[in-house]
Amino acid sequence: MIALEAINVTKVYGTGVNAVTAVNDVSLSVKRGEFIGLVGPSGSGKTTMLAMLAGLLTPSDGQILIAGKDIGRMSEGKRTRFRGKYIGFAFQANNLVPFLTAQENVELLLRLNGKLNRQGRQRTRDLLTRLGLGERLRNRPGQLSGGQQQRVAIARALIHEPEVVLADEPTASLDTERAHQVVQTFADLIHEQNRAGIMVTHDLRMCKYVDRVIQMMDGKVSRTIFDRQAILQLAGSASDLEGVPPSLVAEPASLGL
């Protein structure tokens, strides 16, 4: 079942001679239980695309459907409420509330959705423990390292069991060992909870945990890697997508993108 779909999405900044097209006619879909790696060089449009999928930016053209709802047609108030229920996101600027503990920061999403009860508190503790923060539940953000704060943000993205989970460089502040642990746990939770997940990353080693890799270039989807062997090769030995054999890479047209 498709949880998220982008149809011919374009984002243009500015007007006239100053117009810049950041995303150009991109289509993609993600099924429930599927974890996608979105990669590409700086300026390729991947972060802008993620922000539109999160409902934080409105497309200049095209549609973004989550749970069958076109979020681009919603009023700002309705979209904010929709995001709180259906979308979980962990961006580099994780915006943790400084005077709340790690546990309270994660529980905030449950509180806003009217789901903060004994079961929700236990689920929060279990999730933070699984992310290696079991001994940091009562610490405030200022008492946590950057990597620990990022893991709290990941827990917050998952705790309310959203339809779609989006992450922008979730391992940016983590050492290699912890990065692998966090992304593997992230992927496991997406699969276990049957969510649709997209992770933007510059660290191709993290792609070993995804089900499909989508490359963006100059605002467009340039290629998709769907073969498990190719994904592992990308994550293990290739420095970029050019190192993956063409026979294991699908052009967008062949996938209906």
Residue spans for each PLM region:
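ABC family nucleotide-binding domain
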Residues: 2-209, 215-216
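Conserved beta-strand-loop-alpha-helix hinge in the C-terminal portion
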Residues: 220-248, 252
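Generic low-complexity segments that are intrinsically disordered, proline-rich and/or Lys/Arg-biased
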Residues: 60, 142, 246-247, 253
